[in-house]
Amino acid sequence: MTIYAFYIYSRKCECVFAHRWKPSDRNSMETLVSQLEQNSIEDDMEKLIFGVVFSLRNMVKKITADQDQFMSYTTSKYKLHFYETPTNLRLIFITNPKIDSLTHVLQQIYTTLYVEFVVKHPLYTHVPPSAEEGGINCEIFRITLDRFVRTLSCF
């Protein structure tokens, strides 16, 4: 498994959706412990990811004339893939560093999954991320996203 996480940030810089994939070969006790540890640092992780993306994107804007130059960055442990929509919605994948660019996949997720299952969904109501169960709380979007990502050759 080489895709670790997917995030959506609003134009107000708030994480409105997060989905993580965990390796399936761990035993249940290790999984439970890691989930408890992860829940305590989720909010900080989401803020740190956005801070890094925001800083790098601004630096790239100052260096280059093209506004859409920043698409990914790589460390020794992970690679971050970035796509920003015309409405300033930001989609991010965290993957294995050896994966090629997934910007086209992020665009596809936005146009086929997000627009269809969140924007056009007649029963979906937006809840601000600051609320207890805030952000994108649409189960059909989460399930379809999970199925779509699992079909990718890099998963």
UniProtKB/Swiss-Prot annotation:
Q: Where in the cell is it found?
A: Golgi apparatus, cis-Golgi network; Endoplasmic reticulum
Q: Which residues, by range, are in coiled-coil regions?
A: none
Principal place of residence = Golgi
Q: Quick one: a GO cellular component term? A: endoplasmic reticulum
Tell me which InterPro entries the record gives. Longin-like_dom_sf (IPR011012), TRAPPC (IPR007233)
Tell me the Gene Ontology biological-process terms attached to this UniProt entry. endoplasmic reticulum to Golgi vesicle-mediated transport; intra-Golgi vesicle-mediated transport; intracellular protein transport; macroautophagy
Keywords on record = Endoplasmic reticulum, ER-Golgi transport, Golgi apparatus, Transport
> What SMART domains does its record include?
Sybindin
What is the annotated quaternary arrangement, including any partners? Part of the multisubunit TRAPP (transport protein particle) complex composed of bet3, bet5, trs20, trs23, trs31, trs33, trs65, trs85, trs120 and trs130.
Family statement: Belongs to the TRAPP small subunits family. BET5 subfamily.
Q: What job does this protein perform?
A: May play a role in vesicular transport from endoplasmic reticulum to Golgi.
Listed name of the protein: Transport protein particle subunit bet5
